[in-house]
Every structure is written in structure tokens, then in C-alpha cells.
Design a protein with these regions (language model features):
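Extended catalytic cores of very large enzyme megasubunits
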Residues: 1-764
Length: 764
């Protein structure tokens, strides 16, 4: 039976905004300068008078100014064209664009609902509660707000009025808001859909700030026969071409590097070479660095070798693990005729994967059987690959646009409670944004445009889970943490699918829903089973997931999770769903910083004190502000709190430092003004040696101290050693000024609380 359809749009009541009060007026603002420097003090970016809410950190300000402001074509007060200067412009152009497109195609019940939608989105962005993926910041609203067009770049879209595939006529009238793409590649060299065509399709994606993943398993292995005679040069030779092409492109022009995922099935003839590709290249890098080449990731050593511009993953079916458990062999098969080309002990394959991942963090593993068991649309084909960060897994030639909710904005630190209603409201609000973004988007190929329209996948997620748990005083690796995380994730995904079904009630389900209806409803019911931890209720699942354990989960969160999934299934059974997928949990790298998140995505904190190097140069020192709040909640006094934080972060000053301090520096010949410069630079330094240089102090200072320019101009010059300080003295001063980067061993910290501050790195 076909799904029901009604005639009505979405209604939005106010949650965070106020009637007759502009959302822009709900915040106080600062005008700040944004300067990004290399560790040696050299400026790589500078912009003055950047307007942001006072609550935004300098890091969020710098990300906005350097990465997300439109840098040209924006009308200025004097009538000229220039760049964006305030977050108000960015929030307006994005929220207004979503409102305009949604209103144009009947997404809202009334004009008032559309206005509330717009104002709540502006508030959400300015409050850092939820923001979209980077391509939205780069592209969305440039045409509506500023009239920016640009020549067509070979993109396509499906016109919702007549459902016909059309070629875009400009670069920005329909933006490219999608961050995640999965493209197919056929075993063909030069024709459409083949190997060389893939690099062109990838280039269109990279240019507008997005990333792409592809499964290359169709391409025949080395020495397989070619139709015209001779033998194939093999997959690896072509992967190196794609790697070079990606490395030559900065996605978004000046925003970030190309993002690329390469997937390969575990039975491909060249799988062992693929597994060890980066291992061998890292050996070459080590040799080049030993010979004196730059060891930075953008240095000449890494630029010389291959394999540095993609994440690599192997697709592993359950049948491999059966062979592994039985100490059997694993067969590698020809792409052309399926014959067995090689049989290798499964243990050897697994050991090589583990060794390679240990050596260079690649390849990742994607569990093909499980992924396809949770596939909502198997009638459309198998899931073969993922996007570069591996959160989006769906059909080839589809795209996904993301948004991430900042969980800390819904966490009440006074009683460790979570604002379920506010979180559900925000989920519904932004699921609507992501659906509208599909409506307005253009895509890099005909296939991607058509299938993205047909399936309408979205990627709502969250960030700052690790920080929220840390502030709560709950260890990340604990049953209680898993209960809370499972419930919050279930609420988000359930409400997102409920919203999708709500939109389907008046817009209709996605075009390919009916043929996948039973499969999708089976997957939805399996999600509901996980919310109830009903192990016997799963259908079509070989390896059952861990459900939400009631004994470890706060009751109010568990009730909200099960209700969300009851509603999602009930409405879906009646109306279908507007979107084939709704949620993913992305790493939220750059958008996490603009929301001032201490932790990204679902991950634990990477480190308590972090230094993020930006593409193109520059560093940020990031200190996890969850630590002092967590210590306070755990009952530590302010003095104990300060001592623990200073142990990890450092005092950011030479006042009182051992050996190298204001007094000893005066004795060495530094002036008070020069010492003040050093103390100022110490606030963002991650090693004191980096600030004792000509960029911080000036050539006149170094000359006065007795050093010739040819000496201090040498990059290997160490001023502290030249002044007579010993290595032990420098280390002691460095720990005091810049911190130890860990709380382990900190004064007053109790052993039973160490696990709360555990990190992905061994430095918590």
C-alpha cells in the first residue's frame, strides 16, 4: 500500500528566540583582530575589526575570519566590493538562503513559521549550538545575499518542479553545500565514469570545499589481461595518479586541502600492496628526513612520496573473520573473470593490516557485511564505500550534507542534567535545514545529482560528547558513559527520522522509498530494538549491536530515546520518510573549533592541551576548558584546581619560572620591554624555544646580546643554549611556562579521578 500524504507544512514555535526581538540583538558583540602566526612568530594571516559575539573565543574568531568569511564580491557600505567582516553577515546569508528555498517549495505551514525558522537558525549559529559543514559556510547564500554568480563549472541538479535533470547555469545560484560524496569508478581508462574521468569529477568536488570517497575494487589488478591485448599496469599505478591530482588541489580555493577516501575490497588481487602502500612511503619519508629534508606534513619529504592525500580503508566481509578464526586461507580474485589469483593465510592478511595501521594509521577497516545489513535501500545497490572521514556510508554516486549539534549547549553543569526538549527542538530544526539543502544544491555529475535527489540522504550529528562527559565527572571509557552516549544518539536519530516522516507527510517520501520500504522499515525497527535493548527483536542482523543498557542510563534519557524511536517508526509506517538516511557522527574538525568544542564528534579528547596546525601554516594552542569545570564539580578547591591546570597547561609566563625568568633574563641583558614581549608570546607558545627568536625580539635585541646576523638568521640557531642555559634548565622552565601536557602526576589530583581525564593520546 502506498504511503499517505497530507497538505500542510512544518510549524515552528519559538524555543530560544523572542517575539519582536531580533536574534542578532540577543547577543553582545566584540570587534577583534585575527592574527595567525607560525611557531617562530611569523604572521601568516591578519584581519582587523572582526565582529563576533563576546562568548566566542579567539580561536573561533580566527577560524571564522580565515576560513569562512567570503573574501571577495561582498557589497561594502561605500558601494565597493570586498569581504565579509562580521558573523552577522554569515549567519544571515546561510539562514536566509535556507528559509528562501524552503518557503519557495512549500516547506512551511505559514510565513510566520518560516520567520521563526530563520530566527532560530540565526540564534543557533551565533550561540554555537549547531552549525553546518564547511561547504555551507563557503558557498550557501552568496547568490541570495550578495548576487554572486560565477560561470558554470559543469554541475547538475534535478529541478523539483518537473523532476528533470538539468545542467547548472552558474556557480552559486545553486550552491554546493554537501561535504561528503561517494563516487563510483569503472574499469575503463578514458570514457565517462572511468578512471581518468574520476579525477575530473573529484576536482569539481574539491574546488568547492568538499570531500569524496570511492571503492576502486572494479579496477583489474596488475597482470590481468586487457581486452586489446597485453596486461594491466594494475590498480596501484592509477591510485598514485589520483593521489597526485588531489594533492595539487586545495578544496575551497584557499580554505583546506582536498579530502579523499580510497576503499578496496579485501579480495582484490593487489590488496597486500594497498595495505602496505603508506608503510613503504613512510619508510621513504624517514630516509628523506634523515637526509635533512623538512619533516612537516606539508614539507618536501612528504610532498615527494605518494599516498599522502587520502585516507585508505579495506572492506572486510564476515567471511574473512570466519577464515581467520579457523586459521584458513583468504582468496584474492581476478576482477575480470573471478578466478583465484592467490591464496594467502587469513592470519597473515590480518597481521599486515594491524601492522600497517600501527605504523601509519592506515588502512582503516570497514565491516562490509554489517554495513550492508543496516542499509536502508538495498534495492538501489550495495554500499561499497564511504566519504573521506568514513561517517557517511551509502550508495555510490550520492552525497550528504552535514550539521553538528554542540552537546555542551544542552548540558546543565549545575545538576549534570541534559536539556532533552531543547536538543529535540534543535534536531528537528536542523534536519529541516539539511533537507532544504538537498533541494537547493548542485552536484558534480549527472549521476550524483540524480541519486542524491532520489534518496535525499542527510548527516545530522553532534560534537563535544567527550567534553560533556569530562565535565560530568564520568570517565569516557565506562558503562555509564556508553549509556548516556547511546541514549543521546538514539534521541537525535529518532527525532531526525520522525522529522523526516513529518516532512514526507506533506512533501512525499523520497522517490525510491516504495521499492525499499520493507527494508527501510526493518532497519528502523532494528534501531528501535537497540533503544529498548531488545536483543530478540533484531531482524536480518548477523552480529547484533550493543543496545542501550537501562542500568547505566539516566531514566529520563532512556524514556526520551525509546519514545523518539516509537514515534519515528510509527510515523514512518504511515507516511514513509523524506530521507533515506538522516544522521552521521562526523569528526567536526573545523566546525568544532568555530563552536568552541573541546572534543570533536563522538571521540574522547585527543589531548588536554592541543596544538592544531592549519593547512597553509599557523598553529592554534587549544586548552580543554572542561578540565577546570570537571575539577570543580569533583570537589577540588580553587587552589587545587589552579595547581592541576597549571601543571598541564603551564603558567604562560616567565614570572616565577625556574632558571629562565624575568630576573635571569634581565641579568642576561634583555630589556624590560623585550621580556614583556616574551611573556606575551608565552601565552600561545608550546615550547619556549620557539619564542626566543628574531621574530619575537627583533634583530636589534639579538645584535645587542652579541650575536651576528648570519648566526641568528640560521634556522638551527638556539638562543637559549647560546645564552648558556643547560638542557635541564630549559626543560624545567618549559614545563613551568608551557606545561607538561598531562594531568598525570599533578599535585592534589586523586588516582580515582585519573580515568575522567583520559585521552586518545597517552597524555591525559
Amino acid at each position: 500500500m502506498a504511503t499517505t500524504k497530507t497538505k500542510k507544512g512544518l510549524e515552528f514555535s519559538r524555543r530560544f528566540t523572542k517575539e519582536n526581538v531580533s536574534p542578532f540583538d540577543q547577543f553582545e558583540y566584540d570587534y577583534r583582530d585575527s592574527v595567525i602566526k607560525n611557531p617562530n612568530g611569523e604572521k601568516v594571516f591578519e584581519m582587523t575589526n572582526v565582529e563576533v559575539p563576546k562568548q566566542w573565543s579567539q580561536i573561533a574568531t580566527d577560524i571564522l575570519a580565515q576560513k569562512y568569511f567570503r573574501k571577495a564580491g561582498v557589497p561594502q557600505p561605500d558601494g565597493s566590493l570586498g569581504r565579509e567582516t562580521t558573523v552577522k553577515q554569515v549567519a544571515h546569508r546561510m539562514a536566509n538562503c535556507w528559509r528562501v528555498w524552503g518557503e519557495r517549495y512549500g516547506y512551511f505551514a505559514t510565513e510566520k513559521d518560516a520567520q521563526v525558522f530563520y530566527e532560530e537558525l540565526v540564534y543557533s549559529i551565533l550561540n554555537q549550538a549547531c552549525v553546518p559543514n564547511s561547504p555551507q559556510w563557503f558557498n550557501t547564500g552568496l547568490h541570495e545575499s550578495y548576487g554572486i554568480t560565477g560561470g558554470a563549472q559543469g554541475h547538475y541538479y534535478v529541478d523539483p518542479t518537473d523532476k528533470k535533470l538539468k545542467r547548472s547555469t552558474s556557480a552559486y545560484e545553486r550552491p554546493q553545500p554537501h561535504a561528503c560524496f561517494i563516487l563510483s569508478v569503472s574499469d575503463d581508462l578514458v570514457n565517462e565514469g572511468g578512471i581518468m574521468d574520476l579525477w575530473t569529477r573529484e576536482a569539481r568536488i574539491f574546488k568547492y570545499g568538499s570531500g569524496v570517497g570511492t571503492n576502486f575494487s572494479q579496477i583489474r589488478g596488475a597482470n590481468e589481461k586487457l581486452s586489446g591485448g597485453g596486461s594491466s599496469s594494475g590498480l596501484m599505478s592509477f591510485l598514485k595518479i589520483g593521489d597526485r591530482a588531489a594533492g595539487a588541489i586545495k578544496s575551497g580555493g584557499t580554505t583546506r586541502r582536498a579530502a579523499k577516501m580510497v576503499c578496496l575490497d579485501l579480495d582484490h588481487p593487489e590488496i597486500m600492496d594497498f595495505i602496505n602502500w603508506k608503510v613503504k612511503e613512510e619508510d621513504k619519508v624517514a630516509a628523506l628526513i634523515a637526509a635533512g629534508y623538512d619533516n612537516s606534513y606539508e614539507g618536501e619529504a612528504y610532498a615527494t612520496v605518494s599516498g599522502q592525500n587520502s585516507n585508505n580503508s579495506v572492506r572486510i566481509p564476515n567471511s574473512f573473520f570466519k577464515a581467520l578464526s579457523e586459521n584458513g586461507n583468504w582468496e584474492l580474485k581476478a576482477r575480470t573473470d573471478g578466478r583465484v589469483m592467490q591464496s594467502i593465510p587469513a592470519r597473515e592478511v590480518w597481521d599486515q593490516i594491524a601492522n600497517a595501521a600501527w605504523r601509519c594509521a592506515d588502512p582503516g577497516t570497514q565491516y562490509d557485511t554489517t554495513i550492508n545489513e543496516w542499509h536502508t535501500c538495498p534495492k538501489g545497490g550495495r554500499i561499497n564505500a564511504s566519504n573521506p572521514c568514513s561517517e557517511y556510508m551509502f550508495l555510490d554516486n550520492t552525497a550528504c550534507n552535514l550539521a553538528s549539534i554542540n552537546l555542551r549547549k544542552f548540558f546543565n553543569e549545575s545538576d549534570n542534567s541534559f536539556d532533552v526538549e531543547g536538543f529535540e527542538y534543535t534536531t528537528r530544526l536542523w534536519q529541516t535545514v539539511l533537507e532544504v539543502s538537498i533541494l537547493m544544491a548542485q552536484f558534480p555529475s549527472k549521476e550524483v545529482a540524480q541519486l542524491s535527489y532520489d534518496y535525499r540522504t542527510t548527516g545530522l550529528g553532534f560534537a563535544n560528547l567527550g567534553s560533556m562527559l569530562m565535565v560530568s565527572g564520568i570517565a569516557y571509557d565506562s558503562e555509564k558513559a556508553r549509556g548516556i552516549a547511546g541514549a543521546i544518539t538514539a534521541i537525535m536519530t529518532g527525532v531526525a527520522y520522525k522529522t523526516s516522516a513529518e516532512m514526507a507527510s506533506f512533501l512525499g517520501a523520497f522517490d525510491r522509498y516504495e521499492e525499499n520500504k520493507e527494508d527501510m522499515l526493518r532497519v528502523m525497527r532494528n534501531h528501535r530494538a537497540a533503544a529498548y535493548d531488545a536483543e530478540d527483536a533484531y531482524v536480518g542482523i548477523e552480529i547484533k549491536p550493543q543496545g542501550i543498557k537501562a542500568q547505566y542510563t539516566p531514566d529520563y534519557l532512556l524514556k526520551a530515546a525509546t519514545k523518539a524511536w516509537d514515534d519515528a517508526v510509527q510515523l514512518g509506517e504511515k507516511y514513509g520518510y523524506r530521507n533515506a538516511q538522516t544522521t552521521v557522527i562526523a569528526p567536526t574538525g573545523t566546525i568544532g573549533l568555530v563552536m568552541d568544542c573541546d572534543t570533536t564528534g563522538v571521540e574522547p579528547d585527543f589531548a588536554l592541551v592541543k596544538f592544531k596546525k592549519l593547512s597553509g601554516g599557523g598553529y592554534f594552542k587549544i586548552i580543554n576548558q572542561s578540565v577546570p569545570q570537571s575539577l570543580k564539580n569533583l570537589g577540588y578547591s580553587q587552589a587545587e584546581n589552579d595547581a592541576i591546570v597549571n601543571f598541564a597547561v603551564g603558567h604562560a609566563s616567565f614570572v616565577g619560572a625556574p632558571h629562565i625568568n624575568n630576573e635571569s633574563l634581565l641579568a642576561k641583558g634583555f630589556t624590560a620591554e623585550e621580556i614583556a614581549k616574551l611573556n606575551g608570546a608565552a601565552k600561545s607558545a608550546f615550547e619556549i624555544g620557539f619564542i626566543f627568536n628574531r621574530f619575537t625580539l627583533g634583530d636589534a635585541c639579538l645584535t645587542r646580546l652579541g650575536f651576528k646576523e648570519e648566526v641568528f638568521a640560521d634556522w638551527s640557531f638556539n638562543l637559549l643554549e647560546a645564552l648558556g642555559f643547560t638542557e635541564d634548565q630549559i626543560d624545567a622552565a618549559n614545563d613551568y611556562v608551557c606545561g607538561t601536557m598531562t594531568v598525570e602526576g599533578a599535585p592534589a589530583l586523586k588516582d580515582e579521578h585519573l580515568s575522567i581525564f583520559d585521552c586518545a593520546n597517552k597524555n591525559g
